[in-house]
Curated annotation (Swiss-Prot):
CDD domains cross-referenced by the UniProt entry: CTPS_N, GATase1_CTP_Synthase
Protein's organism: Xenopus laevis
Domain Glutamine amidotransferase type-1: 300-554
SUPFAM superfamilies, A to Z: Class I glutamine amidotransferase-like, P-loop containing nucleoside triphosphate hydrolases
Gene assigned in the entry: ctps1-a
Pathway listed: Pyrimidine metabolism; CTP biosynthesis via de novo pathway; CTP from UDP: step 2/2
Coiled coil location: none
Family note: Belongs to the CTP synthase family.
Name listed for the protein in its UniProt record: CTP synthase 1-A
Keyword Glycoprotein: no
Matches recorded under HAMAP family: PyrG (MF_01227)
Length: 591
């Protein structure tokens, strides 16, 4: 097993996650099996109760793990399935060690950070690195580990010390450290400054880790003189200084690393069994990056949510939209709308914001209402849903978005004016959305219906069934406490709101479609968590197709392949005016 540790310096949030994912991608393209571990030094057990404003979205895994959004990057880039133990937090480590101490496993010894916490970290990493993450079930050969935060943070000290010991335990030829640092370029001088990187590497080396590669994040490509200066002061060769400058799309980052000889360096440094032949997977990434840069047509989607001021709150939703837009050769334009701005209160208090929000909504080609919690902004979301339904605008509601679509329909079409979710109005006489038996209100963490669940299609004419390739069932990831009231199903269906997908017991409403509408779909699960750059998610793909007026054409052509299998390994036709059918139909693999 080979271990690649990615650390960060100067500031957090400079792209360690994307760089770690890109390293995994170029190694996977060399026919290696790669897994990933993300270490978060906070004391929380998991990311389940985080505010979206503080940490961005909570990413959900197959096993129900609520984890950092960086694990979403790993899954999308590497096309793997991780588990909750691939996200290691200080809270999990301390909980594990304290439980052992309570059971008497330490035989009365004084339990300390060194050696007990550091040993627990090393054991966790070595155990998790061996768990298969690919569909073929083969044990990984390389483990990419991202240490969150920056070197020098008091929270990450036990982890740095653990890896200082770890490099000797697994031996030098099996361990490699990549340090990601910022090279700022002040506008006053326009000169690239190396001092922050020098100090960061000096601090890392003082803690016992010496970087093998220094990855410099900068706005423009590094000058040769700057590379040489970093090489001289950071104890690395000039070819070990890697420049990752700002690029047009993140699909360029693996290509950028490949061009600078990162794979060749790993081959020598870690003695990896990598040939020098062209890598097919990277060719696919290059095709995607080229396609992205020459898109001519655009498609606008209104994202009506609560956390629109911080785009990371909807990271997977945005990626799923991008994947689908790229598949139909359209540039995505997202119009972020705070749902509270659509409400009557805003009209009274800030009429300009109100009219601007409605102008954005009305000028969009499709409308998306994603998941969320809490009552704030829900009436604005209902207003947006009503507009999409009445104006026959393509609409996708995810999780809470689906629940509110049912609430809006019950209010307007069935005439139940006080219809609501018991989350927002426990005393409503028409509880259209109710809490589930699993929900335990006494404790907030881990009390939702989480993880991969099966949804059975109950309608042969369902648009969603066709988009999923005609399969009898789908498996998608869930994260919710409330569900559509199954007792009201018949009354809603009689008026045209069809529940075309249910859980395996037929009790939970999972997919809803409106009759006589181009695309009005709600899903209780979160399809964005399984969207991939080369396998877009069917509900999002359907929204984009409907928004550009090509959904009926796509369905008429047979939908013989699920949108999850969009690109073949040899996608040779990538012109902007390519027919959808050419992208979707099976292509012969000539290899």
């Amino acid at each position: 097993m080979k271990y690649i540790l990615v650390t960060g310096g100067v500031i957090s949030g400079i792209g360690k996650g994307v760089i770690a994912s890109s390293i995994g991608t170029i190694l996977k393209s060399s026919n290696l099996h790669v897994t990933s571990i993300k270490i978060d030094p906070y004391i929380n057990i998991d990311a389940g109760t985080f505010s979206p404003y503080e940490h961005g979205e909570v990413f959900v895994l197959d096993d129900g793990g609520e984890v950092d959004l960086d694990l979403g990057n790993y899954e999308r880039f590497l096309d793997i399935r991780l588990t909750k133990d691939n996200n290691l937090t200080t809270g999990k480590i301390y909980q594990s060690v304290i439980n052992k101490e309570r059971k008497g496993d330490y035989l009365g010894k004084t339990v300390q950070v060194v050696p007990h916490i550091t040993d627990a970290i090393q054991e966790w990493v070595m155990r998790q690195a061996l768990i298969p993450v690919d569909e073929d079930g083969i044990e990984p050969e390389v483990c990419v580990i991202e240490l969150g935060g920056t070197v020098g943070d008091i929270e990450s000290m036990p982890f740095v010390e653990a890896f200082r010991q770890f490099q000797f335990k697994v031996r030098r030829e099996n361990f490699c450290n990549i340090h990601v640092s910022l090279v700022p370029q002040p506008s006053a001088t326009g000169e690239q400054k190396t001092k922050p990187t020098q100090n960061s590497v000096r601090e890392l080396r003082g803690l016992g880790l010496s970087p093998d590669l220094v990855v410099c994040r900068c706005s423009t490509p590094l000058d040769t003189s700057v590379k040489e200066k970093i090489s001289m002061f950071c104890h690395v060769e000039p070819q070990q200084v890697i420049c990752v400058h700002d690029v047009s799309s993140i699909y360029r980052v693996p290509l950028l690393l490949e061009e600078q000889g990162v794979v060749d360096y790993f081959r020598q440094r870690l003695d990896l069994p990598i040939g020098r032949q062209p890598r097919r997977l990277l060719m696919k990434w290059k095709e995607m990056a080229d396609r992205y840069e020459r898109l001519l047509e655009s498609c606008s989607i209104a994202l009506v949510g609560k956390y629109t001021k911080f785009s990371d709150s909807y990271a997977s939703v945005i990626k799923a939209l991008e994947h689908s837009a790229l598949a139909i050769n359209h540039r995505l334009e997202i119009k972020y709308i705070d749902s509270a701005d659509l409400e009557q209160e805003t009209l009274q208090e800030e009429p300009v914001r109100y009219h601007e929000a409605w102008q954005k909504l009305c000028s969009s080609e499709g409308i998306l209402v994603p998941g969320g919690f809490g009552v704030r902004g829900t009436e604005g979301k209902i207003q947006a849903i009503a507009w999409a339904r009445k104006q026959k605008k393509p609409f996708l509601g995810v999780c809470l978005g689906m629940q509110l679509a049912v609430v809006e329909f019950a209010r307007d079409v069935l005439g139940w004016t006080d219809a609501n979710s018991t989350e927002f109005n426990p005393k409503t006489s028409h509880p259209v959305v109710i809490d589930m038996p699993e929900h335990n209100p006494g404790q907030m963490g881990g009390t939702m219906r989480l993880g991969k669940r099966r949804t059975i299609f109950h309608s042969q004419n369902s648009i969603m069934k066709k988009l999923y390739g005609g399969h009898e069932y789908v498996e998608e990831r869930h994260r919710h406490r409330y569900e559509v009231n199954p007792e009201l199903r018949r009354e809603l269906e009689v008026r045209g709101l069809k529940f075309v997908g249910q859980d395996t017991e037929g009790e939970r409403m999972e997919i809803v479609e409106l009759e006589d509408h181009p695309y009005f779909v709600g899903v209780q699960y979160h399809p964005e968590f399984l969207s991939r750059p080369i396998k877009p998610s069917p509900p999002y793909f359907g929204l984009l197709l409907a928004s550009v007026g090509r959904l009926s054409q796509y369905i008429e052509r047979g939908c013989r392949l699920s949108p999850r299998d969009t690109y073949s390994d040899r996608s040779e036709n990538s012109s902007p005016d390519a027919e959808i059918a050419e992208l979707k139909l099976p292509m012969i693999d000539h290899d």
